[in-house]
UniProtKB/Swiss-Prot annotation:
Similarity section: Belongs to the bacterial ribosomal protein bS6 family.
Protein role: Binds together with bS18 to 16S ribosomal RNA.
UniProt cross-references to HAMAP family, sorted A to Z: Ribosomal_bS6
InterPro entries: Ribosomal_bS6, Ribosomal_bS6_sf, Ribosomal_S6_plastid/chlpt, Transl_elong_EF1B/ribsomal_bS6
Keyword Ribosomal protein: yes
Pfam families given in the database record: Ribosomal_S6
A cellular-component GO term for this protein: ribonucleoprotein complex
Species name: Tropheryma whipplei (strain Twist)
Name of the protein described by the UniProt record: Small ribosomal subunit protein bS6
Origin: domain of life: Bacteria
Intrachain S-S bonds: none
Record key words, sorted: Ribonucleoprotein, Ribosomal protein, RNA-binding, rRNA-binding
GO BP terms, alphabetized: translation
Amino acid sequence: MLGSPLREYELLVSLGSEFEPEAESRVRSLFTPVEPEGVTVKHLDVLGIRKFAYEIKGRNDGVCVVVRFLANAGSIAEIGRQMRLTEDVIRTKLLRVGRK
């Protein structure tokens, strides 16, 4: 869907707490395969280590990173695939910004 319009999305990514020093570079690398499709990272914020409300994949805490980016609808599936294939990623939550 290269012809579809770019929309703004916000993604919360939780990584293992052992990846705190390189969290930003690890998350940026997940977007590298989709950059040729027009995906642009606008803002990336590392929130640090956060305690989870419940155990996820055997972990009680992780590094949380929030990413705001522009992408077309076709690129979202590939971003999700990249997240699922990366063992460092514990959990993700994707939201379309401005949608009511």
